[in-house]
């Protein structure tokens, strides 16, 4: 009996001893579970708060985007209205300029005429090679191709051929010409990567150069100004000549880097220049493209002052004028070598407002367009022609 009681006491004691760690473990587990539940509840609270803040931020962004869209529409409307007003002002200015044109340059200096005498009178009559009888009545369109290079420069096609190649002279002095196979390559964002570089044997000066019938005619300045005829096919000099012109001065008052400007029209090659002897007005000469000899020379009534460029169309010299603070360029003086155009009957032609001033303007006889360089922008002007009989 006593043994049974002892056994029961031992069993109870062992049970108590083994049950105590289990209770501690359960209590520990319950504590950890409570902490986890608390953290989960806290995470839910934070998640709800963050969701609310994100929703508020999204609403703010949407509201800001809506306001930006409204402001953009408002700015677009303002720009359209401004453009309409500018166009209206341009038309009004054109009308005022048409009703009150600046006086054309028609008077010839009597002293200049007497000084040259019979020598010049012998060459007053010019025998035309073609039957071209067009004159410029209006600049009908302007196309801005791109902006490339320096503020001064020249770009042109071959003015006596059907080639689509583009030739670019960057700056007012260098020894490299860029050649592009087509207009597409020139208008690319990085055009120099598509260009073939032509290194000339002598550096060129000014922007009075030209590509004509596969040859490059450019101006070299040594002791005297020299015209170089360079074959683009063989990359060699074919001929060179010093023009019989003494004491040259800049031919354009607003483009001081140009002393000689070689241009082309339906009649062939011409040279526009100025001398100290006749330092007020521009001179013109007919150039033989084969021998580089001067065929005829004229003193024109067109002033050098405020001239920025010039070109020849059907044997008539058109001089483009501007102001020192660039405004709208205009053809204000016309000199016809055959004497069939009277300056009084030629209207003043205005060019569209652009960026600065023209450093070069090359007339393309085949396309009836002008390739111009305006403060680093390459521009094409389309011309509207009239028969000379329509002026009278």
Swiss-Prot record:
Q: Which residues form the Olfactomedin-like domain?
A: 131-387
Signal peptide range equals: 1-19
Q: Which residues form a coiled coil?
A: 52-100
Q: Name one GO molecular function term.
A: identical protein binding
Q: Where in the cell is it found?
A: Secreted
The UniProt entry, under InterPro entries, shows:
Gal_Oxase/kelch_b-propeller, Olfac-like_dom, Olfactomedin-like_domain
Alphabetically ordered keywords of this record: Coiled coil, Developmental protein, Disulfide bond, Glycoprotein, Secreted, Signal
Instruction: Please give the GO cellular component terms listed in this UniProt entry.
Output: extracellular space
Q: Does the keyword Glycoprotein apply?
A: yes
SMART domains in UniProt: OLF
Report the record's Gene Ontology biological process terms.
signal transduction
Name the protein family. Answer: Belongs to the OLFML3 family.
Subunit text: Interacts (via coiled coil domain) with BMP1 and (via olfactomedin-like domain) CHRD.
Give a short account of what the protein does: Secreted scaffold protein that plays an essential role in dorsoventral patterning during early development. Stabilizes axial formation by restricting chordin (CHRD) activity on the dorsal side. Acts by facilitating the association between the tolloid protease BMP1 and its substrate chordin (CHRD), leading to enhance chordin (CHRD) degradation by BMP1.
Put simply, this protein is called: Olfactomedin-like protein 3
Query: What is the phylogenetic placement of the source species in the record?
Result: Eukaryota, Metazoa, Chordata, Craniata, Vertebrata
């Amino acid at each position: 009996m006593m043994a049974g009681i002892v056994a029961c006491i031992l069993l109870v004691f062992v049970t108590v001893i083994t049950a105590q760690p289990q209770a501690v473990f359960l209590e520990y587990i319950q504590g950890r579970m409570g902490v986890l539940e608390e953290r989960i509840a806290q995470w839910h609270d934070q998640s709800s708060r963050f969701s609310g803040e994100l929703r508020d931020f999204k609403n703010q962004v949407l509201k800001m985007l809506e306001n930006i869209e409204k402001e953009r529409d408002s700015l677009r409307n303002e720009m359209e209205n401004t453009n309409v007003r500018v166009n209206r002002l341009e038309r009004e200015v054109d009308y005022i300029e048409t009703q009150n044109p600046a006086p054309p340059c028609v008077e010839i200096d009597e002293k200049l005429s007497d000084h040259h005498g019979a020598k010049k009178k012998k060459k007053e009559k010019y025998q035309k090679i073609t039957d071209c009888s067009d004159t410029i009545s209006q600049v009908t369109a302007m196309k801005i191709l791109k902006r490339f290079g320096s503020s001064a420069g020249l770009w042109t096609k071959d003015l006596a051929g059907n080639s689509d190649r583009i030739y670019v002279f960057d700056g007012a002095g260098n020894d490299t010409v860029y050649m592009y196979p087509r207009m597409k390559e020139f208008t690319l964002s990085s055009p120099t990567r598509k260009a073939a570089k032509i290194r000339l044997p002598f550096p060129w000066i000014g922007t009075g150069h030209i590509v004509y019938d596969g040859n490059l005619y450019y101006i070299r300045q040594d002791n005297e100004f020299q015209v170089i005829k360079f074959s683009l096919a063989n990359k060699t000099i074919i001929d060179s000549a010093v023009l019989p012109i003494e004491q040259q001065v800049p031919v354009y008052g607003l483009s001081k880097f140009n002393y000689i400007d070689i241009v082309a029209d339906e009649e062939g090659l011409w040279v526009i220049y100025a001398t100290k002897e006749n330092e007020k007005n521009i001179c013109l000469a007919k150039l033989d493209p084969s021998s580089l000899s001067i065929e005829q020379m004229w003193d024109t009534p067109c002033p050098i002052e405020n001239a920025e460029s010039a070109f020849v169309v059907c044997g008539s010299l058109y001089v483009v004028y501007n102001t020192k603070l660039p405004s709208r360029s205009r053809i204000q003086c016309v000199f016809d070598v055959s004497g069939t155009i009277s300056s009084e009957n030629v209207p003043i032609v205005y060019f569209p407002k652009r960026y600065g001033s023209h450093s070069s303007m090359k007339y393309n006889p085949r396309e009836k367009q002008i390739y111009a360089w305006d403060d680093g922008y390459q521009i094409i002007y389309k011309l509207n022609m009239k028969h000379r009989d329509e002026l009278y």
